[in-house]
Amino acid sequence: MYKVEDIKTVHLEVTQRCNAACPMCDRNENGGAVNQHIRGNLKELSLEDCKRIFPPEFIGQLNTMYMCGNLGDPIVAEDTLEIFRYFREHNPKMWLSMNTNAGARTTEWWQELASIFGRMGAVIFSVDGLENTNHLYRQGVVWEHVA
């Protein structure tokens, strides 16, 4: 039987919101409106939620924390940087990682994320094409923010 002490990796979905409307995503209806089954019920974890769910002693036992949404993108969540900072503060040696479409933040935001991650983290960018084709798959993504 597993115990809380055995948990070494957390996959955290901080938001169900997304800046994109990708046709292949279950979050929306064929690249259009938000799926009727989640519309009006889009939620987001705040820094305070994460502090309540993940006490410092629990964070201290982790090796890895990933942010990747099934229905959202962590870059649109209000407290993403603060949540990463909280995890880093309580475990400087853990690996931090995030998957994103990359199309919703400024250079300054990315620089702040890099300073939190340091050499113990990575961002996986989901870019599906070049400037003239990415929008076919990642609808709603601002190419200038990606490039």
What label would you give each PLM region?
Residues M1-A122, T133-H145:
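Conserved alpha-helical substructure of the radical SAM core
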Residues V127-E131:
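A glycine-centered beta->alpha junction motif in the catalytic cores
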